[in-house]
UniProtKB/Swiss-Prot annotation:
The gene is HMGB1. Disulfide bonds join 23-45. Heparin binds at residues 1-10. Residues 83-94, 162-179 have a biased composition (Basic and acidic residues). This is High mobility group protein B1. SUPFAM superfamilies: HMG-box (SSF47095). A motif (Nuclear localization signal (NLS) 1) lies at residues 27-43. The lineage of its organism: Eukaryota, Metazoa, Chordata, Craniata, Vertebrata. Residues 9-79, 95-163 bind DNA. Residues 187-215 have a biased composition (Acidic residues). Belongs to the HMGB family. Its main location: nucleus.
Length: 215
């Protein structure tokens, strides 16, 4: 595979990624000619991050927020080259893919493993979780599989409604109504004034749906 589009906006970085970048720059200044053991370096960064106060982390969190805003702004104006037109900017309001049974299992046991073995790397933690899952009896896996199936079913309904109407919560109002809304929108696309009115209505709908979710 070749390199991606060089004009594509650089991906957004997390607060921890900014912290690691800063650590790397500090290390280079102190030891410009020394080679870096990535595994050992990552471990030290992780340990240092855990001991930092919320105030100390705040600087990096602000950097991450600013970078996220930059990324979203650039992606709105980014036009992918031919052949990549299907790769659209990921809508933050789109329904999130449901976790697998194994992922749910990991979410529950990862904190326990980290607590018992604080020195383990991310890779080692993942390996240990994989071994635990493989050694778990089918009956014990069942609750995770059942929950994952329910989440998958909900996701399929939400994504169908989202694709029809363009809103993640449209399933509450039904897919049929969502399709009517889409048709209405297409008919009004040529009339700018009506299109503006429709956008205002959509915003009101979203606010109402968010209120429903909060209840």
């Amino acid at each position: 595979m070749g390199k991606g589009d060089p004009k594509k906006p650089r991906g957004k970085m997390s607060s921890y990624a900014f912290f690691v970048q800063t650590c790397r720059e500090e290390h280079k200044k102190k030891h410009p000619d020394a080679s870096v053991n990535f595994s050992e370096f990552s471990k030290k960064c992780s340990e240092r991050w855990k001991t930092m106060s919320a105030k100390e982390k705040g600087k990096f969190e602000d950097m991450a927020k600013a970078d996220k805003a930059r990324y979203e702004r650039e992606m709105k104006t980014y036009i992918p080259p031919k052949g990549e037109t299907k790769k659209k900017f990921k809508d933050p309001n789109a329904p999130k893919r449901p976790p697998s049974a194994f992922f749910l299992f990991c979410s529950e046991y990862r904190p326990k493993i980290k607590g018992e073995h604080p020195g383990l790397s991310i890779g080692d933690v993942a390996k240990k979780l994989g071994e635990m899952w493989n050694n778990t009896a089918a009956d014990d896996k069942h609750p995770y599989e059942k929950k994952a199936a329910k989440l998958k079913e909900k996701y399929e309904k939400d994504i169908a409604a989202y694709r029809a109407k363009g809103k993640p919560d449209a399933a509450k109002k039904g897919v049929v109504k969502a399709e009517k809304s889409k048709k209405k929108k297409e008919e009004e696309e040529d009339e700018e004034d009506e299109e503006d009115e429709e956008e205002e209505e959509d915003e009101e709908d979203e606010e109402e749906e968010e209120d429903d979710d909060d209840e």
